[in-house]
Amino acid sequence: MNNNVNQTKWIKKVEENLKLRGRSQKTFDNYKSALLRFFNYYNEETNIKKLKEEDIINFVNDEYIKANKCKATYNTGVAAIRLLYLVCFNITLNKILLPSSKLIKRVPTILPRDKFLIIINNEESLKHKCWLILSFCSGLRVDEVAKVKVEDINSKEHKLKVLGKGNKERYTILPDITIKLLRLYCIRKNIRTGYLFPGSNNKEVMNSKTIINYFSVIKVDYNLDNNISFHSLRHAFATYYLANGGSLLALQSMLGHTDLNTTTIYLHLAQNFNELAGIKYV
């Protein structure tokens, strides 16, 4: 069996393992890219299974460290290789010789409220308005926006059930403005059950890249800073929620953070905001 066939089988096993662990398609795509880089580094005659750890370290040095790749890319590459050897060859690589790099926490970039209001008030598509407001007013990640179902909406209690990372469920708040917009969208689109934003066959989940591509156009149209992304809407939700006097523990739960330290970074951002979000959360 040639290496190309083996590599396809190995990548498939890695994908199956990631799915069992509830990891996202984006994570698998990143792992697959890292593994293809690893395979392409060696010639076709190389027996990947029998590589020594020093050979793998040389690859990491050449392709990540000397190439000046960012820490996140380095960590993904190392994690992908470790998982490959574990699930395909039952080999545990030495974490001391092949360590992960500690990531430097960056201060989140938020989309200011005034910019958000300009964008959403000028947006003609009701669907696009819903995407924007679910992140800005409820703190959803882009993948989570794509997965929202009619059954997840509890308008009576102003709550939304969210299917987050690792398929973990949590609840976040639904302001009146969001409920009204979602209700209008469902009426116009005649959506009574299932996904709010279905894929091409009206049953599958919409690809979140559709939202990302839409926001890329928004960035150009409104001349937004390069650091602004769709995720900046989620950062804005967290910042304005705390600026309005919201609870840090409640925010941790709504964002789906395992570690409270991840949430505390928004405290520093919130202290810099003199004006409140102006959004009625309950």
Language-model segments: which ranges?
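Conserved catalytic core of the tyrosine transesterase superfamily
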Residues: M1-V282
